[in-house]
Amino acid sequence: MLDKLLRLGEGRMVKRLKKVADYVNTLSDDVEKLSDAELRAKTDEFRKRIDGGEDLDDLLPEAFAVAREAAWRVLSQRHFDVQVMGGAALHFGNVAEMKTGEGKTLTCVLPAYLNALSGKGVHVVTVNDYLAKRDAEWMGRVHRFLGLDVGVILSGLTPDERRAAYHADITYGTNNEFGFDYLRDNMAHRLEDRVQRGHNFAVVDEVDSILIDEARTPLIISGPADAASNWYSEFARLAPLMEKDVHYEVDLRKRTVGVHEVGVEFVEDQLGIENLYEAANSPLVSYLNNALKAKELFQRDKDYIVRNGEVLIVDEFTGRVLLGRRYNEGMHQAIEAKEHVEIKAENQTLATITLQNYFRLYDKLAGMTGTAQTEAAELHEIYKLGVVPIPTNRDMIRQDQTDLIYKTEEAKFIAVVDDVYERYEKGQPVLIGTTSVERSEYLSKQFTKRKIPHNVLNAKYHEQEANIIAEAGRLGAITVATNMAGRGTDIVLGGNVDFLADKRLREQGLDPVETPEEYEAAWESTLNQIKAEAEEEADDVRAVGGLYVLGTERHESRRIDNQLRGRSGRQGDPGESRFYLSLGDELMRRFNGATLEALLTRLNLPDDVPIEAKMVTRAIKSAQTQVEQQNFEVRKNVLKYDEVMNQQRKVIYEERRRILEGEDLAEQAHKMLVDVVTAYVNGATAEGYAEDWDLEQLWTALKQLYPVGIDYHDLVDSDAVGEAGELTREELLDMLIKDAERAYAERERELEELAGEGAMRQLERNVLLNVIDRKWREHLYEMDYLKEGIGLRAMAQRDPLVEYQREGYDMFVGMLEALKEESVGFLFNVTVEAAPAAPSNRVAPVAAPPGLSEFAAAAAKAQEQTGQGAVATKERETPAPTLRAKGIDNDDTPPLTYVGPGEDGSAEVQRSNGGPRHAAPGGATRRERREAARKQAKTSKPTRRRG
């Protein structure tokens, strides 16, 4: 129903976009008459008009006409009307659904150019580094022609290179790189270490992949935790002793385990504990669940392999080994214990954000994809994005054949090879889509046996695969590819002329970045030559039926199936698609497989005879809809829980930003001092009269905080307040606050004598920043721990989410109170020395890596032009330190681990350099490790200054 409601305004929107395209067309003649210099000068004219108050919406027709003409002059590609419509849809903050081959990459040039004119930056988000670099080079030619600067964010760049790229007018990069830079910026200890400059407008390419498929995996930066645990080994010993359906049950569809009462009693007997579910033992529940999951749900040589004493994950979608990735929440350690290999230490979360909440930071968000309609409800609900289907430039004439279903997988693959051989004989290009590398290799062997030449792609080497995909539409080309392989590159009948021309020029030693002038000079003649050759071949391919897409299995998402089909029939070309299925396929096994098997058995058909039935199609659609709904619920659930963290994250990050930007914190430090002293006094005077108060205990606690200058004996015996019984809480508080203020002023005077004027302000900044970071890390750990066990609240008829929100808020308030107390303690007691004089506060320039020098140079030039160069940076730099606080100003950076979604949506892990990591001593529960972390944080305080 929601889908239908969302589609009600589609027709009106498309008509509105058509009017925009028509208006842009009326300006074409005038723009075509302009010289190159006059066309480039339009950029400066537009910027002046924006400075004068003109709106981007008003500039749209002229800016689009200019960018369209520039693309024609530079790339020999002119935007079709439907691409202009798509560009307008993106500018207005929508998802433009454009079929494969309709030119999404070129479409993006229009809104990127228009929005970059504001000077606030545009981020173009792609699914991998290769596409980011390719698009920055390829489309960057148009933007540079118009006088804009283009940057690209790739993994492995230094902070200086990243900063230069972000200060360009348009920045290309992957979702993970943008997200991790945001998190790192909010871990920075100096303003000049931050690299991003805000979140103005983002265009997300393959928006369904990034905002839907990858949104289940949050971005996490983590560092080594303080201790490992021997509980993994203990539960790995217990799991084989427990019997399935006696001690526990397994749900393969939901991939969960549930422990029966008998199982709980068995574990309690084995461990010698009274109650597994009491608060002190609650961490053991996750160890038990993980051990049983490792036993029942994770199979060796299917889900993972063991190589050289290390557990390596196997990708369920592609079948390849995922080096460097680890399961989270203790699952990987449970498998290591099961396989009796070294159990590596758990990591502690230092910063985290979901992709949903990262992309909601942008003032305006837009996206492009060939398949968004099936996810329109989710895009609207979570991102407030409308989906606008853009008409195709030419009518679609591809023939989508009905599915063929075989009884066995072997029979299915025999039929696939026969079909491909028949097509190869007549020269028709074929693209075979598989769900795993294992199946790709199996098919490859079968093709080799039949002497069918072919290429195999497995979504690992993006650049090499893009080149193969670019030639997959040529006569007789047979290409086997996993679902994700080669995305972002068109399969053009006769070959992709842009890629073939680029390939030929690179073979001649020309490069668009290293030798731009020679490359541009040779581009047009080479392109025309390639076009003529390719068009002749394309006619031959059309004559034999165009590209044939053959799917060997249905994916759990209809979108992925549609993406595979969409490879064929681009731009009105002929084409054909068909899926071959078997009862052994994963989707069929999980849903309704038994019903279909019973039907085939009743029909008594031989294994090699397929059936085509509407019932099969309905069963598949039903199964896919169920899986899509389940995945949507998972993503919604992730977002609901992260929303609690998101509000807290905003408070902490805003506080860090204020500190980094050098805001005077004297008033804030004074308020903290008053709050902490007040809390101490309130705690000591909460009950009874003055004679009942334990002032000795209060004074002992206060002396740990600051050098108290008054004696409580004198206070009680003083004539100022009369008898002890006449001392009021207000009088006591007033005297102690005045005493604390005196001590703080004395501390400030001492520091200024040691390190000069402003030393106390600098210490306040350093202390607050470090304490905030430590307390936030501790809080993230506590919140992880809370979320792990919150599901058990459902057993007590309580809503886990409501409980998480309530307890999470209480923990956050408690953390802020502890933050004040620890900050005040550090400000008084930390040992301080004058900082050694630094030879220079300027950062030495870093050379850009090969292929990126132009981006770095262009960005540096942009900084100068926009006033964000050396002068602007100097104003925003953190002042040079004049003092050093022991235990706080620590330059050592621990090795960090980055977890984010891979292209297939599963978690991908990268580690920064930090030396070898060793497992810490075991034997502690997670709660004990948490306590140890807290104690270590406290003991890191140096010897305090005596008052």
Curated annotation (Swiss-Prot):
Domain of life: Bacteria
Binding, ATP: Q83, G101, E102, G103, K104, T105, D490
Alphabetical list of Pfam families matching this protein: P-loop_SecA, SecA_DEAD, SecA_PP_bind, SecA_SW
PROSITE patterns xref list: SECA, SECA_MOTOR_DEAD
Presence of keyword Cell membrane: yes
Any one biological process term the GO annotation gives: protein import
GO MF terms, alphabetically ordered: ATP binding; protein-exporting ATPase activity
EC number: 7.4.2.8
Reactions catalysed according to its record: ATP + H2O + cellular proteinSide 1 = ADP + phosphate + cellular proteinSide 2
InterPro entries (alphabetical): Helicase_ATP-bd, Helicase_C-like, P-loop_NTPase, SecA, SecA_CS, SecA_DEAD, SecA_motor_DEAD, SecA_preprotein_X-link_dom
Enzyme class of the recorded protein, top EC level: translocase
Compartment(s): Cell membrane; Cytoplasm
GO cellular component entries: cell envelope Sec protein transport complex; cytosol; plasma membrane
Chain intervals for the UniProt region annotation (Disordered): 860-947
Keyword Protein transport attributed: yes
Primary location: membrane
Biased composition (Basic and acidic residues): 925-934
Subunit organization: Monomer and homodimer. Part of the essential Sec protein translocation apparatus which comprises SecA, SecYEG and auxiliary proteins SecDF. Other proteins may also be involved.
Main function: Part of the Sec protein translocase complex. Interacts with the SecYEG preprotein conducting channel. Has a central role in coupling the hydrolysis of ATP to the transfer of proteins into and across the cell membrane, serving as an ATP-driven molecular motor driving the stepwise translocation of polypeptide chains across the membrane.
Family to which the UniProt record says this protein belongs: Belongs to the SecA family.
Record-linked PANTHER family: CHLOROPLAST PROTEIN-TRANSPORTING ATPASE (PTHR30612:SF0), SECA INNER MEMBRANE COMPONENT OF SEC PROTEIN SECRETION SYSTEM (PTHR30612)
Name of this protein: Protein translocase subunit SecA 1
Organism: Mycobacterium sp. (strain KMS)
Lineage: Bacteria, Bacillati, Actinomycetota, Actinomycetes, Mycobacteriales
